[in-house]
């Protein structure tokens, strides 16, 4: 089971505002582990009222000061720069790593970024659905939920057609696809992605067994 505890090294000073339920935050956590940087990060757990999806709720102390958008993940670098976006946080960690990279440094990076954008857009649709499901029934929009489901199905079909790109050296595109599929599995109101997508299903079965994925399995975020 995932435990958001990392060794804190004062000389590094990198902080990550975290929730174990967020796939965007998990993406950063997987990257940090794959790049052997996890132990250099101070994890700051955040709490969220279940009303976060439709109204302003109290924030964990320090989050809104670091990032006025008050979004997670927010990574604060050792220079004090707040990166309030998972893509920026992954770019920072990739740049910081000296032994391994998850972002190619040649022209193949554009194909990776293309796949990444599809998977990241699917993550966004999943979280928009989550927020809508948290709204009281009388103000919930079923048509909005269906709109996000349609987006997710399109993204899954597109990734299935590009499943061959998921092979080869580990990169950020693969990580984001893996995290997205895991979230699709975790939330019971999201449809099973495996039906009609044999290539994606076979790839995910192996990817989900990576130590970085097992160590960051999602859990519900504390409300208090």
Regions from the language model: what does each represent?
Residues 90, 94, 113-116, 156, ...:
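Non-transmembrane alpha-helical segments in soluble domains
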Residues 105-108, 170-172, 218-221:
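Short, surface-exposed recognition loops or helix-turn segments adjacent to catalytic cores
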Residues 25, 64, 83-84, 103-104, ...:
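Generic, ordered loop/turn and secondary-structure boundary motif
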Residues 192-224:
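Long hydrophobic alpha-helical segments typical of transmembrane helices together
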Residues 119-205:
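GST-like fold's C-terminal all-alpha helical module
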Residues 1-142:
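GST-like domain detector, emphasizing the conserved glutathione-binding G-site
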């Amino acid at each position: 089971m995932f435990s958001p505890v990392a060794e804190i090294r004062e000389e590094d000073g990198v902080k990550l505002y975290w929730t174990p339920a967020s796939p965007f935050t998990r993406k950063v956590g997987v990257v940090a582990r794959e790049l052997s940087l996890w132990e250099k990060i101070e994890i700051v757990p955040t709490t969220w009222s279940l009303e976060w999806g439709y109204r302003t709720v109290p924030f964990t102390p320090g989050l809104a000061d670091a990032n006025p958008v008050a979004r997670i993940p927010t990574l604060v670098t050792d220079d004090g720069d707040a990166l309030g976006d998972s893509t920026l946080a992954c770019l920072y960690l990739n740049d910081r790593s000296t032994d391994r990279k998850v972002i190619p440094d040649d022209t193949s990076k554009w194909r990776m970024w293309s796949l990444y954008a599809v998977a990241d857009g699917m993550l966004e649709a999943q979280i928009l659905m989550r927020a809508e499901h948290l709204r009281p029934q009388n103000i919930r929009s079923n048509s909005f939920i269906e709109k996000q489901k349609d987006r997710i199905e399109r993204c899954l079909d597109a990734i299935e057609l590009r499943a061959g790109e998921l092979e080869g050296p580990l990169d950020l595109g693969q990580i984001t696809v893996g995290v997205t599929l895991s979230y699709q599995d975790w939330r019971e109101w999201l449809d099973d992605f495996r039906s009609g997508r044999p290539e994606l299903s076979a790839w995910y079965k192996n990817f989900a067994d990576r130590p970085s994925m097992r160590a960051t399995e999602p859990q519900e975020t504390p409300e208090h």
